[in-house]
Amino acid sequence: MSLQNNEQLDQLRHSTAHLLAAAVMQLYPQAKRTIGPSIDTGFYYDFDFGQDKISETDLPKIEKLMRKLALTWKGFVKNELSVDAVKDEFKDNEYKIELIDEHSGAGEVLTVYQSGEFRDLCRGGHVEEPNKVLKYFKLLSVAGAYWRGDEKNKMLTRIYGTAFFTQEELDQYLYVQAEAKKRDHRKLGRELDLFSFSDMVGSGMPLYSPKGALVRRLLNNFVEELQSEQD
């Protein structure tokens, strides 16, 4: 993929992160949004849902609203505002205020982008016609994430998704991910009764079942035989 295409894909995915935030804020108006970047595999957005709890069972309704909103988004409108004006707009969101304080200086102008009725603090990098290209996306999972990646901060809810320019690209990505899950050693170990994990001994320390211990011993013997043949 060319550098230009990479940039376009980043813009598409970041734009879809905006769309995700818009849908979440409409469904959960008490939630507080934080950041939503594009990443190598798609995008994510972190939220503080307060007393509300969401899981992957909530993703279909969020995605459904995203598709509905996307049809109404004709573009991303850039608004250049003073630091004070942006602080006033996001005064009820301590996460945005923290970001504003970090990236603002005396007399500096910040940018807020708007699509439809949704506005978000953002430096830019979006698609030009969201209602035409924000079509081929999928919300994938929900996870916990500390604000700013610091375990001393509050645990937020991170929603992951991915987006492409065509249905074929999206289908191919989802197929590859599904096949990878089938071959996940943690999944296979559990299903084949080879080993398990326990938080009591550490997440990276497998506990072998008798069957798993036998397989490991046979593999070790096989490797030793190969090494002896090469000596």
Where would I find each of the regions flagged by the language model?
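Auxiliary tRNA-acceptor-end handling modules of aminoacyl-tRNA synthetases
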Residues: 1-11, 23, 28, 32-38, ...
